[in-house]
Structure formats: C-alpha cells, structure tokens
C-alpha cells in the first residue's frame, strides 16, 4: 500500500519576508510536506487544506501600521499549533493583547539569544549553556506581553525574543530560525513540525517518487507525452521520473542549439537514450541558431531569438510525434511561487518565469509538471534516487540560452568553440582541486575584445576569457569564491596554452549586488 505523503502538511502564510521560501525548505528538510500561501488565505480554504501546523512568516511591515497585513482572527482558534516568526510573532502578540512598538535600538545581524525562565518544548536542544547564536532582522519589538504567554528568550537589546503559550500550542520567535546564520535553527523548526505538530516525516525521496509515478500514471493513462530535454537538472529529472512511470509513452526532444557546454549533447544522449532507455529525438540546429543570432549583440534580444527559435523547432518535431496529447515540463516549486506572486501582486517578482514557455495555444497539449511541488535540492535528491549520474544531478545552473549569454555581444561559432573549451578546462580543474562542490555556480565568459600578448618570440593579439565563481544560498545575493592563487594560475595557464585564440584570463571578483551572477 502506497504512502499518502500529503496527509501531514504544514501551512506557511507569507507576509512578504525575503526568507519565506527558506522556511519551506527547512520544513521539507524535516521530511514534512508544506505549502506557501498568501497571508490573507481565507479561513475556509485553510480548513480545507487541513494543516497539522501553521507558520506565520516575517515581513517588511509594522503590525501597528494602518492596513498592515493580518490573518483572520479565528485562525488562532483552529486548534492547530502556530509558530510566528518575526512579524508573525508580533502579529500573534498584538492579537492576544500585547503591544508592539518601534525598538529603541533595531537589531539586524548576529545576536546571542539568552534563555529566560524555563524553555518549553519548542526549544529542546536549541540552547547550549543557556544561549544560542541567532540572526535578527527587526525594527519593532514586543513591549507588553500578550495574555497567557511566557517569555522564553531575550537578547541584550530586546527583553522579549521568544514567547510561548503551551496550553494553546502557540509559539513566537523574534529571530529567523530558517536562515543559515541561525546555526541551530533547523533543530527548532524540526521540533515544531515533528514533536509539536506530530508529523512523522513521510516526505522522503522514495515516497515522493512513488507518489509521483502513481499520479503520472493516473493522469496520463495510455496517452503519449513529449518533453523538451535541455540537459539541465530539472528537465533531466522530470524525464527520468516520467519514463519510470510510463516508459515508451514518453518521447523527449533534445534541441542541440550549438550553444551547449563541451560534449553536452553526447552526454545527454548517452545518459537517457543509451543508459536509461528513454526515447530521445536529437535535433542538430546549430546552424539555424547561429544564423538567427548573426549581428545581434543585445542580451535581451538574443534571449528572445533563442527562446522563440527553440519553440519553433520544438513545435516542428512535436508535430511528427503521433498521438502526443501531453507536454511535460520541469517546472519546480519556486517557479510556481514566482508565477503566483506575479499574478496576485502579493510578492515581489524578481523575474518572469518561462519554461518551455510560449508554446502556441493551437498545439492543444495538456500540461504535465511532475516536479511542481519540489525545491531544487529535492529535485537533485530525486534525481540521485532515480539513478541519474551524480555529475549531472549536481551540475551548476546553466542559463536557458546557454553560451548565447556567456558570449558578450554577437554570437559566432568561433567564439562558442573557444568558450566551451575554456569552460571545460575551468570546470575540470575545479573538480580536480576539490572546489566544485563548494561553489554554487562557476563558468567562463567570452569577452569579444583582443589584448596584446607574447608567446615565444612573437606578439599575439587574441581574445580574453573571464572566469566567474560564486557562493550563495538563494542566488538573490552572492559573494565571489576565493579561489587560491595557485589554482587560478594553473587554470589560466592551461586555458592560454590549450585554447587557441586566447592569450589572457581574468577572474571576476564582483559580488551580487551590485553585479549579477551572469554577465548578460
């Protein structure tokens, strides 16, 4: 009998915090399913969702402002445990008669949280010798305690940093347990969802695969599915998962646009067609893409040209597959959240999301998105469980337009060939030196400028390659990776000696912000 992995679930109500997705990821790491919804989710919808616990996120507003975001008051009478984080704690405090005012001294950054009184069940294992380092980000604080609550923790600047009413299973923390800067934060969230809410931890890779396979079979029946395979993590895992469910009913279309990494097309075919037995149609479209991109230097126009041509080619190939009624995409949960935010206007939208996107409506294909409940780290775990090569599953992000936006300015075959060889050397050396898995994203960039050099007794006038490597948790902010000088020297030497047309290599030490991770 299969496990229903959605019976135990946590509801996270979002008040606009930049960290809300991290809350969801921490809950998932405790092997418990959760969903993010806007703060004004109606009470009937919440009852229908039937959460085993509710988490109120932080947010940029002040609870005492006119029109400040709030929940329906009856939410606290549902009889399920509630954890308020930052703004969520202040909202809960105000609801139960407490007072929230601007702090005399705001707290942003690291702070030492000190136990006050007897910590309740939420704080088991959280304090060590009566204290715990935490991450603060607030300008308001609770000045008068809500009725029925006890103070559990304080800092040197704020006397009320954690509160509890164990009789009603209501808890609040002023700090952010979801961020990595709160070292034992995952313990607190795990305790809340497992011990206080009573979840048993059914959200595991094996159970997720079993559930997805059953749902795909129920949705698709005996109909045929097509999927645009890019070689990226999301589409690769989606392909492996769907193939496990319906076998030869899946056909993948792999468009080789000539802007992939070195030997990437052959690797994709070897992994899927040869090893996993997936039916893959490979389309060699390099010349069509290069022709379409000729003389175009604007990054956004290049993206549109590449995206539109992909759709055109995908449509051509799909029309040849008889009986296909489903289009599969590697949409993941952050894509769903961003799209929902863009539609409702209740979340700050950083970018518009397009997957296979923009397929003509007249194709009349039904949409199959087996990964839409999963975060990227969960997708990777599923990929490993499905038997995909670790190097494919944990590969760094690669932009949809490929090398088209890592070649600055106009795209030419000569430039793409130089860049993919330089990039391959760079990545190979990062693996060899043990850096690759410590870096969030690393890649080479082709600069369409020439510099003077000397090789042997002769003068050279050749191109420049820039190397980029960053560390980040969320890709919203990023710091440059401190690659040791000896490794920089070895990588630079290999690229200049082995890649014809390059005589200079530079290393990008810009953080995000102000720079972006990609150059275009």
Swiss-Prot record:
Keywords: ATP-binding, Glutamine amidotransferase, GMP biosynthesis, Ligase, Nucleotide-binding, Purine biosynthesis. Its EC number is 6.3.5.2. SUPFAM superfamilies: Adenine nucleotide alpha hydrolases-like, Class I glutamine amidotransferase-like, GMP synthetase C-terminal dimerisation domain. Residues 9-202 form the Glutamine amidotransferase type-1 domain. One of its GO terms (biological process) is GMP biosynthetic process. GO terms for cellular component: cytosol. Pathway: Purine metabolism; GMP biosynthesis; GMP from XMP (L-Gln route): step 1/1. GO terms for molecular function: ATP binding; GMP synthase activity. It is an enzyme of class 6 (ligase). ATP binds at residues 230-236. The active site is at 86 (nucleophile), 176, 178. Residues 203-395 form the GMPS ATP-PPase domain. It comes from the Bacteria. It catalyses: XMP + L-glutamine + ATP + H2O = GMP + L-glutamate + AMP + diphosphate + 2 H(+). CDD domains: GATase1_GMP_Synthase, GMP_synthase_C. It holds the Pfam family NAD_synthase. Catalyzes the synthesis of GMP from XMP. Homodimer. This is GMP synthase [glutamine-hydrolyzing]. It comes from Geobacter sulfurreducens (strain ATCC 51573 / DSM 12127 / PCA). The gene is guaA.
